[in-house]
């Protein structure tokens, strides 16, 4: 059975790159009818936090990336790492190294000055000397000195690294915790991981991990190293490109299906398809279709996709998402029926839930027009026309059709073009120059509030 895993370190939030790796691993497992494992690599005691663990779990849940096993935690498996390290020591495949940090720093400096690649020199590999007193050793792996570590990467193709290029990596730190390369190997082995899908910043780790797996007599999983994500400027994606946490996008009003769709297209494609569901992604997903070149992160494309998903979203769902924002702004909200109408009017005009909240503000409170709009639309000539319209609006039943007829009649009787009246009317009531159909807007704002705003704004007109 195919088994994939996502194994983040809880030292921050679930970011865009990590989310894409998780998505590809999840999609491949689902496509193959396999299992997807979540593993938390929390052995960096100084940087790992429970807050980060929760942020990862929240991000996965929001994106709908459900896992079949886990979350497993490395710190709960310490005895296993220690057990296997002891086994390798007994088999002569690992050794204790007592070199101090100062010694190793001095060695690296000598190598640097000599123009050599910094690497451990194996000074304790076959040493017979007495260990120094009071020094807790690390455990190092005896990397083979001959031959090659070879693997057929499912994205990059065949990769071969000469073993003499690799130094004897540390397996266990002096504090009894495993290093990344040792922990990940044992975890993948014990959990039966068949396919390791991860960022290509791990390519250099793979030959080391393969050598450890061979020493343990294990079956080597298949590897797929996904190219990194770049900013529009070609530099590695960072916060300055907008590469914030997944939950930041949620809080900014993006829908999870938009982010999933966008992440899937970052370095993977299915023909010319731009928009597809999570179910279609699973149906179409193929590691061979992952591009070998880095993908460029484009916030505008993500926003475009989000706009699409907002347009087709159920009004009830959008109301559920926008209501907490509106209540947080202390707005008094109308009943469900009118809220649905407001959302339906606006959802094709906005790109995020946050924008939906912003765009709906004038339905819940009077918004003062900008001075430039007053200057443009509040004219001496239009004032008597508006006074006439206000008197007529005060007498009608407050329905959209009736409002429309009164505006139309006023335009006709004063020999105006529709925008000549609709624009100042719109600005007076909403404070905006662009809104949905003005009759629909006025109906939802309500008769009393509309008339109040119109009369209030008349005072701002030149006499």
From Swiss-Prot:
Superkingdom, natural source: Bacteria
Mind listing the UniProt keywords for this protein, alphabetically?
A: Aminoacyl-tRNA synthetase, ATP-binding, Cytoplasm, Ligase, Nucleotide-binding, Protein biosynthesis
- Which Gene Ontology cellular component terms are annotated? cytosol
Which reactions are catalysed by this chain? tRNA(Glu) + L-glutamate + ATP = L-glutamyl-tRNA(Glu) + AMP + diphosphate
Gene3D superfamilies, per the entry: 1.10.10.350, HUPs
Q: How does it assemble?
A: Monomer.
Q: What class of enzyme is it?
A: ligase
User: What is the stated purpose of this protein?
Assistant: Catalyzes the attachment of glutamate to tRNA(Glu) in a two-step reaction: glutamate is first activated by ATP to form Glu-AMP and then transferred to the acceptor end of tRNA(Glu).
Biological process annotations from GO: glutamyl-tRNA aminoacylation
Q: At which positions is ATP bound?
A: 239
Q: Tell me what this protein is called.
A: Glutamate--tRNA ligase
Q: Where are the transmembrane segments?
A: none
Protein location: Cytoplasm
- HAMAP family attached to this UniProt entry: Glu_tRNA_synth_type1
Recorded GO terms, molecular function? ATP binding; glutamate-tRNA ligase activity; tRNA binding; zinc ion binding
Enzyme Commission (EC) number? 6.1.1.17
* Organism phylogeny: Bacteria, Pseudomonadati, Pseudomonadota, Betaproteobacteria, Nitrosomonadales
Q: Which CDD domains match?
A: GluRS_core (cd00808)
Motif 'KMSKS' region, per the record, lies over 236-240
Motif extent ('HIGH' region): 8-18
């Amino acid at each position: 059975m195919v088994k994939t895993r996502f194994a983040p370190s809880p030292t921050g939030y679930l970011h865009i790159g990590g989310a894409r790796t998780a998505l590809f691993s999840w999609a491949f497992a689902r496509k193959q009818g396999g299992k997807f494992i979540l593993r938390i690599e929390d052995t960096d005691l100084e940087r790992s936090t429970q807050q980060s663990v929760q942020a990862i779990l929240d991000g996965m849940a929001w994106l709908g990336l459900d896992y079949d096993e886990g979350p497993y935690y490395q710190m709960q498996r310490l005895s296993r790492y220690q057990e296997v390290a002891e086994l390798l020591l007994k088999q002569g495949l690992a050794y204790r190294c007592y070199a101090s940090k100062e010694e190793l720093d001095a060695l690296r400096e000598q190598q640097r000055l000599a123009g050599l690649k910094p690497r451990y020199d194996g000074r304790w590999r076959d040493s017979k000397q007495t260990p120094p007193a009071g020094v807790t050793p690390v455990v190092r792996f005896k990397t083979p000195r001959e031959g090659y570590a070879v693997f057929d990467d499912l994205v990059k193709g065949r990769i071969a690294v000469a073993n003499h290029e690799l130094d004897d990596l540390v397996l266990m730190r002096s504090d009894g915790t495993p290093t990344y390369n040792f922990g990940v190997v044992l975890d993948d082995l014990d959990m039966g991981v068949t396919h390791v899908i991860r960022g290509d910043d791990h390519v250099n780790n793979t030959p080391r991990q393969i050598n450890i797996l061979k020493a343990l007599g294990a079956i080597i999983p298949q590897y797929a190293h996904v190219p990194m994500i770049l900013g529009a400027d070609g530099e590695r994606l960072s916060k300055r490109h907008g590469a914030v946490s997944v939950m930041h996008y949620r809080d900014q009003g993006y829908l999870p299906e938009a982010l999933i769709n966008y992440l899937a297209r970052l370095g993977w494609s299915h023909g010319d398809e731009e928009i597809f569901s999570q179910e279609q992604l699973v149906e179409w997903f193929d590691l061979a279709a992952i591009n070998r070149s880095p993908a460029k992160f484009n916030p505008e494309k993500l926003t475009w996709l989000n706009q699409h998903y907002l347009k087709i979203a159920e009004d009830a769902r959008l109301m559920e998402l926008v209501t907490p924002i509106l209540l947080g702004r202390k707005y008094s909200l109308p009943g469900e029926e009118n809220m649905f109408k407001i959302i339906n009017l606006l959802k094709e005009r906005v790109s995020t839930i946050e924008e939906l909240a912003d765009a709906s503000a004038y339905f819940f409170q009077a918004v003062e027009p900008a001075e430039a709009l007053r200057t443009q639309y509040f004219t001496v000539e239009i004032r008597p026309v508006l006074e006439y319209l206000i008197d007529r609006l005060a007498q009608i039943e407050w329905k959209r059709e009736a409002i429309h007829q009164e505006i139309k009649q006023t335009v006709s009787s004063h020999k105006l073009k529709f925008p000549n009246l609709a624009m100042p009317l719109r600005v007076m009531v909403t404070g905006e120059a662009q809104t949905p159909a003005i009759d629909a807007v006025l109906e939802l704002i309500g008769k009393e509030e509309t008339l109040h705003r119109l009369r209030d704004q008349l005072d701002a007109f030149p006499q």
